[in-house]
Amino acid sequence: MQLPDALWLQDPALRRVVNALKVDGQPPRIVGGAVRDALLGIAVADVDIATPLVPADVIKRLEAARIKAVPTGIDHGTITAVADGRTFEITTLRRDVSTDGRRATVEFATDWQEDAARRDFTFNALYADPESREIFDYFNGLSDLKAHHVRFIGDAEQRIAEDHLRILRLFRFHARFGQGAIDADALAAAATHASKLMALSRERIADELRKLLSVANPAPAVQVILDNGIFASFLPEIVDDAGSRLAQLIERETASASKPS
């Protein structure tokens, strides 16, 4: 399968970055949200790039191509390239050495599937060759995307143990992309480990909740969160009918926005 051809793939800034990072003629790969959104027909905003090159080599190659390289997350292998006013996040392939639910210690790798295995959901682990547009799918992300099914890669409990924020990301991604019931294994794992959210900073939780509430209709996902007691450990003051009240508010706001002025 291929990415649909689109103007963003022909962006001269992207072409410059891709050409600078070729290894033995092979380009780096686009990964994550850009691939997912392109396949869904959603406008692509941010383009993230994965490469087997280590950060020092990424910086060297970018600078040789007169592209600004900013070491925004160099300990985790991430360099931000600034080309023609556009920014691209470039990350070296990685494997997790240890995790504590808040942060991971990583080491760099050269295996694409190993890098994919450390990601959260199957449709976020899709890679694409920016030149041939070939898609690389290691965990059946394409079929899950087609079915609008949000599924953790491998064992849901293990994915949550690696990063507790994935509990809330599950509901955000389901609210945005999912159809039907939330994946049963994912929901069970989220409910079991909900108390681990208390180990995270309030800033990270608040940011994720803002993202959830910014989707078109977050109310059903919020209600599932409430029904499963996931807010109880860190937001006990939220009333049980908050989901239905949020749905009513969205309905009123939608109706108000659609009225002729």
Role assignments for model-derived ranges:
Residues 1-261:
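Catalytic cores of the polymerase beta-like nucleotidyltransferase superfamily
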